[in-house]
């Protein structure tokens, strides 16, 4: 391939832009703490993981053997026997959520899906694409689902097989829906466990909960039927990707034979990026359980540092337990644009990812927010402090 000088100049400018902004994503959960340079040599190959990694595909240039090890790692992490599970490396959390909602719909074709108003916006798209009747449930000030409203709505709809879309770390407030309480509440209205489906959207916190001392319920042992995690968030990847995992006996119900590739396929996208499997494999092979614990503890410590800095001057900042998302009153537009802060309504947040590994990485932002809010901080409040 050969580019003109003008095109080369454009690429070089973009390179400089990326270099300048690599660590400037404090409002979004993207980790920049990764180095996959050892994998650069594989970029010359078109690696396509089309189909089921459990089977040999007629498309030889795949990374199934690496994907298989990645899925074994996550089956252990989320506490389900490897042979009882099936999942794959997706293009991101949204695809994982779609796969799980599709799976749930195939098991319960007449079910309604229930999710809180704090749920990621992708679910609104998914329910329209899959044509699943949906109910959006109120959220508590913390960002958790309103459990009573959930039960009331299910009873009002006379649903015998509801699909529950639970959050393990909401997008804006880092809140986790209590899976055990949901099951207890559903039992109280006469639903057996096999009568409904629980999906866990753990895009960010799926790589937090397994490594903290007192996790919220998050695993298959805790009662979930499927889970979706982003690979480019806590783990880190140059290409967005995700991991979705479900119970194998459920997935087998949607499996189809594809003669074109001489294999089965249960995935949403068909052709899948085989390089992502190499990224995820390299990440899990180069980190021990203790290493991941260290990364998570660092993130949570930096989140607590940020909360304390704000609270010391009277700004009502807070975070949920086991969350590296710090919520505070939204500063003025020049400040949130300068620091790429995500905001919703009257609040904004900072997400302390692994590359924000010390106070010096956060202090300039914290000071800008304090300077912006301090004249008004007595009348600005964030609802939902735990």
UniProtKB/Swiss-Prot annotation:
Keyword Lyase annotated: yes
GO annotation terms (biological process): carboxylic acid metabolic process
Gene3D superfamilies: Type I PLP-dependent aspartate aminotransferase-like (Major domain)
Pfam families: Pyridoxal_deC
Source organism, top-level taxon: Bacteria
A GO term, aspect molecular function: histidine decarboxylase activity
Enzyme class: lyase
Keyword annotations of the record: Decarboxylase, Lyase, Plasmid, Pyridoxal phosphate
Record-listed E.C. numbers: 4.1.1.22
Catalyzed reactions per annotation: L-histidine + H(+) = histamine + CO2
Positions annotated to bind substrate: 120
Cofactor: pyridoxal 5'-phosphate
NCBIfam families per record: PRK02769.1
Subunit structure, interactors included: Homotetramer.
This protein's name: Histidine decarboxylase
Record organism: Vibrio anguillarum (strain ATCC 68554 / 775) (Listonella anguillarum)
The gene coding this protein: hdc
